């Protein structure tokens, strides 16, 4: 039924495999045959990972096997208490705000997880929907309910093949547990696709993936045309996004289908010199969800993401845009930001609900049909991870738990701030008006090579770099230097070799307060010189 998986397994079982492929498959089979599954499961439950071993096996495996991909794609399983809280909140709000008596179980509800992983969010939504149905109507008609609602109206997208395959297996298990066995011509609508790419894939020649273009076509139709009422999930966190294309650029920067872009504020350009954090993947997924709901005219978004957008000035256009689309926004800041060394208000330890350093927040956003205006509500949740899990596991969404914020131009903060004197504050000159020539700091993009505590050490490195008898692989191995989109190592070495003034680029650098080092300040090495400002610091100056 699932074209891609059918193609892959058919190819492995009956296809003409190369000798290398046969060895790989045989090795995998031997490892699986030798695995003590009961012991693994006992260890899993002993460590308190939750109810769903499929999810954790995948994330743990990827962390060991390919940590770069895990980091690049932002693969972090969502703790089940978080998932349960969000799905319960959506179910409750469908009933109370949209007067849909059966909540997620209603036939008029369409649901999408655009970054599905192993289907943790859709799985929980299905459990809630089936429970609602059984409580109201009993077991009679349950099979028909699953066929005509769950398999018809629930969608999910996933980019990576492994979680895609696991997700389909998991869904088959779940539905069987709920008393429904899928027929040969049925499938759950999880599609292998990049949510942030609107182009249909062309027919591929890769063995075992002949159905990829068909899968892409189905997904594209949902992205572009299918009205979605509920969008949930845990989008990837990746500051250096791999998702850069013309469509995402338009989605973020321009007004699309009436939804204000994130690069404007109060009708004016943001004028941010460094707006790279608006390119983070989680921002793009939130924007995609906002666009789908805005286009549909009503709906709910329930997601857990990086919490930086709540108060970072760069995101003020994003905050205003969300307020222009949604009528009610509920934000639970789960904190846990070790990068900021966050602590609980009483000075006790504050932990993240994920195994990451970046703090996170749950957002539940509601758009009602033909409604105007927006109210933003906020709640803090500090403390130990287990206490946060306990709260999210047991507590239901209650509006009075959240505090109404006074969100004002030009910042539109999504956290509690005293804004009583904001107009007085805004009447003062901005610092960039006082200092018209300004920038952020130098970016070498290769500090370990371009900066040193001792000038002689740095001179040795540059001497090696200019010596064309050394291979570029040497610098990759010893200094982690390699070409990037903005810098070519071969070109830089060649140009520096020809530069007769190469010995004139050593300067003292205040790397951090009271931390003086030496930098090789040349565009052949330093990626962003910030020369308009730094040229004033190169010689004697009050600065």
Region roles according to the model:
Residues 1, 70, 95-99, 371-376:
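Short, solvent-exposed secondary-structure capping/transition elements
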Residues 1-29, 76, 499, 504-509, ...:
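Nucleic-acid modification enzymes, centered on SAM-dependent nucleic-acid methyltransferases
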Residues 2, 21, 25, 50-55, ...:
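Alpha-helix initiation and N-capping motif
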Residues 4-11, 83-85, 114, 388-391:
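Eukaryote-specific, cytoplasm-facing alpha-helical/coiled-coil scaffolding segments in long proteins
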Residues 49, 61-332, 341:
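SAM-dependent methyltransferase catalytic region
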Residues 243-245, 272-273, 291-543:
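Sequence-level detector for compositionally biased, low-complexity segments
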